Design a protein with these regions (language model features):
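Short, amphipathic alpha-helical interaction segments positioned at domain boundaries
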Residues: 81-105
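Short acidic, hydrophobic short linear motifs in intrinsically disordered regions
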Residues: 30-41
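Exposed, interaction-prone assembly regions rather than primary DNA-binding/catalytic cores
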Residues: 2-4, 23-26, 39-40, 46-51, ...
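Short amphipathic alpha-helical interaction segments
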Residues: 47-63, 81
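Short alpha-helical segments that sit at the start of domains
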Residues: 1-31
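A short, conserved structural fragment
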Residues: 61-74
């Protein structure tokens, strides 16, 4: 159960996606490595596991708000996200010219 000052789960996920877009905006249009993004979010008091960050980036990528560079890791038989960059559509979302119910700022 969420504490008094914690937003409900759905809202928390929406806000985290918004924070990811905000962090990527700082380096637009350049790529930000996965680890750098993870550390930048941690500096903003949003520590995310690799699995959670992949989930958020995948959601944002499906909406064409971010572009992810991936590599297949043969040792784990998994595709890993190496870096991400904000797209022009992501800028429009950040500037409130587009709306997405799953992203809040």
């Amino acid at each position: 159960m969420a504490g008094r000052n914690e937003p409900p789960n759905a809202l928390r996920h929406d806000l985290r996606r918004g924070e990811i877009i905000w962090v990527l905006k700082q380096d637009y249009p350049h790529l930000v490595t996965f680890r750098h993004l993870q550390l930048a979010l941690r500096d903003r008091n949003i520590p995310l596991s690799e699995r959670d960050l992949v989930s958020y980036l995948s959601y944002l990528e499906e909406g064409s708000y971010v572009r992810c560079v991936r590599r297949f890791d043969e040792s784990d038989s998994l595709e890993r996200i190496l870096a991400a960059a904000l797209t022009a559509r992501g800028i429009l979302l950040l500037d409130n010219k587009l709306t997405d119910a799953g992203v809040r700022f």
